[in-house]
């Protein structure tokens, strides 16, 4: 079953800690997320990591952040 990714403006989170994911995540770094309602129901986030691929990580490792629209356009990996 394919997960539908809804086309919304890019969302970003800041990594608070990388416990258990030291190779994939850097604390205090901003990451883009992809909407995934099924993952969110399991307290997970679909995050685009250092490799440019999206993976599921525990939502507790991140905090959502609001960015100015101009910065969102600059940081968005896919538009």
Task: Describe these PLM feature segments.
Residues 56-79:
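C-terminal structural segments of small proteins and small subunits
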Residues 1-3:
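Short, Lys/Arg-enriched N-terminal segments with co-localized hydrophobic residues
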Residues 14-57:
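Basic/aromatic-rich interaction segments and small domains that mediate binding to polyanionic partners
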Residues 7-13:
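Short structural boundary motif marking the start of a folded domain
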